[in-house]
Amino acid sequence: MIILKDGYKEFADCMYYFLHYYIGYGRYTYSATNGSCDKGEYLDKRHNQCCNRCPPGEFAKVRCNGNDNTKCERCPPHTYTTIPIILMDVINVENAQQDHLIR
């Protein structure tokens, strides 16, 4: 296990997502091993395949289908996601502020 100083964990996570989603890692689905998937992925139980979660700032335009992986797209202006997700929606910043989700 690598111990990172304050602030470096975010950098490491950012690099992981860059490599995983933009360079080509994780382009295809694969069968889950012992029912588990790698970091940044989720188990699609319908197909027993490991699929990409979308990184923060993106949402699932198309969910994985067992052959093709999740297709992520940047969130529209004034919306966001803060965690890797598989949702096909984003949170409206104005609504989040009204609901006290942003402090």
UniProtKB/Swiss-Prot annotation:
TNFR-Cys repeats lie at residues 36-73, 74-103. Pfam families: TNFR_c6. The keyword Disulfide bond applies. SMART domains: TNFR (SM00208). Keywords: Disulfide bond, Late protein, Repeat. Disulfide bonds join 37-50, 51-64, 54-72. PROSITE patterns: TNFR_NGFR_1, TNFR_NGFR_2. The keyword ATP-binding does not apply. It comes from the Viruses. The A53R protein from Western Reserve and Copenhagen strains are predicted to be inactive because of mutations that introduce stop codons or frameshifts when compared to other poxiviruses. Belongs to the poxviridae A53R protein family. This is Truncated secreted TNF-receptor-like protein A53.
